[in-house]
Amino acid sequence: MAAKSKNIQVVGRHIVNGVRSRAVAYGLFTSRNDHTSAYDKNVEEELQPSQVPDEMIKPDSDKYWSPHPQTGVFGPSSSSTNAKDEFRGGQEDSVMEEKAWFRPTSLEDLDKTHHS
């Protein structure tokens, strides 16, 4: 009889422990969903898209930006190019025309021979 009641107690403990572990697991699962972080996006702080009124946009603007012929830098295009810029551009040497010297990397790994 004592063995039978002992078995009932063991089975009862397993059932109670299973219910407790499910409750704890459920509690952990719900707390993960409620987690907030300082890095979360705040919807109210987002910038809302705005439209530019048509009066502000000029359809036939005479000031377009284009690349400079020598430098390639974009800026407001001008109908007359500066003569000084053209003269100076012709005088300067191109970077492509400069000589470059390269040291072979294979020399760094060689052992120096000592002549005696």
UniProtKB/Swiss-Prot annotation:
<feature type="compositionally biased region" description="Basic and acidic residues">
    <location>
        <begin position="55"/>
        <end position="65"/>
    </location>
</feature>
<feature type="compositionally biased region" description="Basic and acidic residues">
    <location>
        <begin position="83"/>
        <end position="101"/>
    </location>
</feature>
<dbReference type="InterPro" id="IPR039291">
    <property type="entry name" value="At5g17165-like"/>
</dbReference>
<dbReference type="Pfam" id="PF22272">
    <property type="entry name" value="LEA_3b"/>
</dbReference>
<protein>
    <recommendedName>
        <fullName>Late embryogenesis abundant protein At5g17165</fullName>
    </recommendedName>
</protein>
<feature type="region of interest" description="Disordered">
    <location>
        <begin position="37"/>
        <end position="116"/>
    </location>
</feature>
<comment type="similarity">
    <text>Belongs to the LEA type 3 family.</text>
</comment>
